[in-house]
Amino acid sequence: MTLYSPIVTESTDFKTYLIDNQGNIINSWLHPRGVASMPYLQDDSTLIYPYRVENPSMNIGGVGGGLSKYSWDGELLWSYEIANETYQHHHDIEPLPNGNILVIVYEKKSAQEAFAVGRQTIENPLNQIWAEAILEIQPVGMSSASIVWEWHIWDHLIQDVDPSLPNYGIISEHPELQDINYGSAGLGPPTTRPGGADGDWKHLNAIAYNEDLDQIAFSSRNHDEIYIIDHSTTTQEASGHSGGSSGMG
């Protein structure tokens, strides 16, 4: 069987299809908004569907902003949006065995915040860099959610330009940290993307969870890298460099 949601740009008929190996439709779901990445069919026959909100706070290809849960019969059971001045969901999600959902989000940082941690340039007229974070959200009721765990790339930076800053170090000796000066921070005129100027830095795409190891893996398109982080940590441990099963935060 195959589950898919066609990406259509000009339509009010957004659907998810479950088909068999002969292409016959087993079930379908109708949605008011277009898909952000890919849907997930759960063991209990519910569907988790990431969708593109009407007005994303950080706009670029693959942007989403909303999550919905449907019954097998298409009844909307839950819907929640992550599209505000701090966070913007984009690309993939990962439903967890406990019913929670891992969500990739942009985390907006100003040029001043970037310079304060050693960033040397901002390549876009927004004067922003869109960092990345992983949020574990727990659905609450019909339209709410709680963040029960989180990991922020901003807590794991290194730079070798300004020795007066606490994150100064030899980059090659710290593969667990991210060089704040690696890669461009978005695009501006005349090379803007269809959504306009942006602060996209790493551009995370896919996320997956390994239940046996309690680890999260995700990929960066812009930097051609795959990362693995420890999910056994507390949120406080995840912001540092110790604790958890790996002992590295």
Residue ranges with predicted function:
Residues 1-249:
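Histidine-/acidic-rich catalytic cores in large beta-rich domains
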